[in-house]
């Protein structure tokens, strides 16, 4: 997805769409958790918001989750920590072919063996159409113009942390309330859109802190929760990864101080 993003003209809306494509492909087409009412991770979301054979709230949540955590934020972290690779494709023809082939092969294996559930044909076909539509929109999206307004320049780390917590809270707590599923879906989507909108309004340093704040929720409190639930070593891995990101970022800033540097904003 990162290679397509660079080749198609960057922009954070485009990155969001490509991340969403990945989420739809993984959860909808490969794992089929969009449709399986008994998928192991669903919990309440196997019934809350299940419409026409689709776990709609789960589908929205996992699309947002993968768009951010599986695609967009890793891409932005790499660009921040290794600025010399920014705007440069990392794979050429053979590398792209190997990556695409590996993803397709692993996807087929998981489709067949990970979850034997057979999704409804019409809904599954429409999900394939959705993937094509999102790819087309991402491909032909107009190149964004530079932004002049400012984003969350004060305490971007805390802002990112707050958005991550609120997204998690909305999609884990609200299904236990009397709120209609459509409200839960829309709240999460609006928060994700607002988060993406901030990325293009910040300088490089503030953008990284915003991203790190979002990631910190999953690396520290969430991983500690997983540790308490029996996932041995998860807390140590999360905290260590967070500290390593901080150390690497400090090294980058020391080599190329960003204080007073020109603001690099995109949308």
Where are these regions (language model features)?
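Membrane-anchoring/interfacial helices and their immediately flanking loops
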Residues: 30, 39-62, 134-167, 171, ...
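Membrane-interface helix-loop-helix junctions at boundaries between adjacent transmembrane segments
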Residues: 10-16, 20-25, 29-99
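Hydrophobic membrane-targeting alpha-helices
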Residues: 4, 28, 76-81, 198, ...
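Hydrophobic cores of alpha-helical transmembrane segments in multi-pass inner/ER membrane proteins
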Residues: 1, 62-79, 126-143, 185-195, ...
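Membrane-interface helix-boundary motifs at transmembrane edges
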Residues: 4-11, 84-92, 141-154, 198-205
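Extended, charged low-complexity segments
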Residues: 145-267
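Interfacial loop-to-helix transition and helix-capping segments at the boundaries
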Residues: 62, 116-126, 173-184
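Loop-centered beta-sheet repeat module
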Residues: 86-138
């Amino acid at each position: 997805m990162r290679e397509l993003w660079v080749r198609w003209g960057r922009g954070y809306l485009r990155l969001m769409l490509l991340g969403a494509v990945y989420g739809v492909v993984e959860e909808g087409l490969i794992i089929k958790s969009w449709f399986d009412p008994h998928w192991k991770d669903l919990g309440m979301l196997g019934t809350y918001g299940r419409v026409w054979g689709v776990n709609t709230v789960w589908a929205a949540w996992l699309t947002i989750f993968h768009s951010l955590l599986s695609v967009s934020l890793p891409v932005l972290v790499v660009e921040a920590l290794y600025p010399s690779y920014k705007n440069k494709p990392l794979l050429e023809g053979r590398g792209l072919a190997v990556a695409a082939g590996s993803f397709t092969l692993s996807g087929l294996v998981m489709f067949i063996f990970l979850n034997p559930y057979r999704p409804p044909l019409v809904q599954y076909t429409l999900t394939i159409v959705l993937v094509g539509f999102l790819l087309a929109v991402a491909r032909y999206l107009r190149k964004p113009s530079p932004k002049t307004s400012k984003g969350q320049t004060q305490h971007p780390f805390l802002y990112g942390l707050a958005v991550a917590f609120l997204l998690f809270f909305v999609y884990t707590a609200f299904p236990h309330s009397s709120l209609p599923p459509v409200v839960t879906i829309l709240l999460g989507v609006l928060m994700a859109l607002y988060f993406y909108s901030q990325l293009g309004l910040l300088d490089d340093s503030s953008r990284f802190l915003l991203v790190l704040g979002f990631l910190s929720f999953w690396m520290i409190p969430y991983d500690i929760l997983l540790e308490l639930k029996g996932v041995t070593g998860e807390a140590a891995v999360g905290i260590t990864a967070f500290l390593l990101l901080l150390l690497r970022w400090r090294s980058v800033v020391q080599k190329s101080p960003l204080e007073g540097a020109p603001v690099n904003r995109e949308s």
